[in-house]
Amino acid sequence: MKVKKGGGGAGTATESAPGPSGQSVAPIPQPPAESESGSESEPDAGPGPRPGPLQRKQPIGPEDVLGLQRITGDYLCSPEENIYKIDFVRFKIRDMDSGTVLFEIKKPPVSERLPINRRDLDPNAGRFVRYQFTPAFLRLRQVGATVEFTVGDKPVNNFRMIERHYFRNQLLKSFDFHFGFCIPSSKNTCEHIYDFPPLSEELISEMIRHPYETQSDSFYFVDDRLVMHNKADYSYSGTP
């Protein structure tokens, strides 16, 4: 597939599925966050994710998430809504200036995966990733992210990803990538180019000093309907 161009981003990782990272670790529970929209407030809540306005809206389309001004409080769709059985199996990120591969992660083939007891399986397992980067990552200007994914027995029309990055609920950058059409039962590979936004020295220092307060939502759409939602947070201190 073609190389696609986007806006900005960052990465190192701890996860159970492909994503921007240098190391792989178990998924980490997502902490509670603020409301999904800067324009609609939510009541105070106890422990756990807070419901937001978009969680009560179906279906959710691209324009809905493009209006979000802060990280979502919870996932906006269930794993069961991925009726196309889209499965990301490999992820690689490289510095476009030097060509250096910053990290690569790959799922083992289905035949090599350990059997699981579905009754004990967290329904959100694999949807959250924790990334650990060095401070130097914040000074990169452009990276290429190669993703390999498979689809099930349904055709995938107008496959699109919108990824929004925040620091302390301030929007840093929004990326919008179009994968296009994927034929049924296919394996697909493409590289997206992330142009990172310029960051002030003050903001870089704050992002380094406050690990995991940089967060992102990744929304995946088929025919303008949300079918997958992944989350991540980031540390740029170079340590877990």
From Swiss-Prot:
<keyword id="KW-0206">Cytoskeleton</keyword>
<dbReference type="GO" id="GO:0005829">
    <property type="term" value="C:cytosol"/>
</dbReference>
<dbReference type="GO" id="GO:0007602">
    <property type="term" value="P:phototransduction"/>
</dbReference>
<dbReference type="GO" id="GO:0061098">
    <property type="term" value="P:positive regulation of protein tyrosine kinase activity"/>
</dbReference>
<keyword id="KW-0813">Transport</keyword>
<feature type="region of interest" description="Required for midbody localization">
    <location>
        <begin position="1"/>
        <end position="59"/>
    </location>
</feature>
<dbReference type="GO" id="GO:0008289">
    <property type="term" value="F:lipid binding"/>
</dbReference>
<dbReference type="GO" id="GO:0000281">
    <property type="term" value="P:mitotic cytokinesis"/>
</dbReference>
<keyword id="KW-0716">Sensory transduction</keyword>
<keyword id="KW-0963">Cytoplasm</keyword>
<dbReference type="GO" id="GO:0000922">
    <property type="term" value="C:spindle pole"/>
</dbReference>
<feature type="modified residue" description="Phosphoserine; by CK2">
    <location>
        <position position="39"/>
    </location>
</feature>
<feature type="modified residue" description="Phosphoserine; by CK2">
    <location>
        <position position="41"/>
    </location>
</feature>
<dbReference type="GO" id="GO:1900186">
    <property type="term" value="P:negative regulation of clathrin-dependent endocytosis"/>
</dbReference>
<keyword id="KW-0653">Protein transport</keyword>
<feature type="compositionally biased region" description="Gly residues">
    <location>
        <begin position="1"/>
        <end position="11"/>
    </location>
</feature>
<dbReference type="InterPro" id="IPR008015">
    <property type="entry name" value="PDED_dom"/>
</dbReference>
<dbReference type="InterPro" id="IPR037036">
    <property type="entry name" value="PDED_dom_sf"/>
</dbReference>
<dbReference type="GO" id="GO:2001287">
    <property type="term" value="P:negative regulation of caveolin-mediated endocytosis"/>
</dbReference>
<dbReference type="GO" id="GO:0051233">
    <property type="term" value="C:spindle midzone"/>
</dbReference>
<feature type="region of interest" description="Disordered">
    <location>
        <begin position="1"/>
        <end position="61"/>
    </location>
</feature>
<comment type="subunit">
    <text>Interacts with CABP4; in the absence of calcium. Interacts with DNM1; leading to a decrease of DNM1 GTPase activity. May interact with GTP-bound ARL1. Interacts with ARL2 and ARL3 (GTP-bound forms); this promotes the release of myyristoylated cargo proteins. Found in a complex with ARL3, RP2 and UNC119; RP2 induces hydrolysis of GTP ARL3 in the complex, leading to the release of UNC119. Interacts with NPHP3 (when myristoylated). Interacts with CYS1 (when myristoylated). Interacts with MACIR; interaction only takes place when UNC119 is not liganded with myristoylated proteins.</text>
</comment>
<dbReference type="InterPro" id="IPR014756">
    <property type="entry name" value="Ig_E-set"/>
</dbReference>
<feature type="modified residue" description="Phosphoserine; by CK2">
    <location>
        <position position="37"/>
    </location>
</feature>
<dbReference type="GO" id="GO:0045202">
    <property type="term" value="C:synapse"/>
</dbReference>
<keyword id="KW-0446">Lipid-binding</keyword>
<protein>
    <recommendedName>
        <fullName>Protein unc-119 homolog A</fullName>
    </recommendedName>
</protein>
<keyword id="KW-0182">Cone-rod dystrophy</keyword>
<comment type="similarity">
    <text>Belongs to the PDE6D/unc-119 family.</text>
</comment>
<dbReference type="GO" id="GO:0042953">
    <property type="term" value="P:lipoprotein transport"/>
</dbReference>
<dbReference type="GO" id="GO:0006897">
    <property type="term" value="P:endocytosis"/>
</dbReference>
<feature type="binding site">
    <location>
        <position position="131"/>
    </location>
    <ligand>
        <name>tetradecanoate</name>
    </ligand>
</feature>
<dbReference type="GO" id="GO:0007399">
    <property type="term" value="P:nervous system development"/>
</dbReference>
<keyword id="KW-0844">Vision</keyword>
<dbReference type="Pfam" id="PF05351">
    <property type="entry name" value="GMP_PDE_delta"/>
</dbReference>
<feature type="region of interest" description="Required for centrosome localization">
    <location>
        <begin position="121"/>
        <end position="240"/>
    </location>
</feature>
<keyword id="KW-0597">Phosphoprotein</keyword>
<dbReference type="GO" id="GO:0045171">
    <property type="term" value="C:intercellular bridge"/>
</dbReference>
<keyword id="KW-0254">Endocytosis</keyword>
<dbReference type="InterPro" id="IPR051519">
    <property type="entry name" value="PDE6D_unc-119_myristoyl-bd"/>
</dbReference>
<dbReference type="GO" id="GO:0005813">
    <property type="term" value="C:centrosome"/>
</dbReference>
<dbReference type="GO" id="GO:0007268">
    <property type="term" value="P:chemical synaptic transmission"/>
</dbReference>
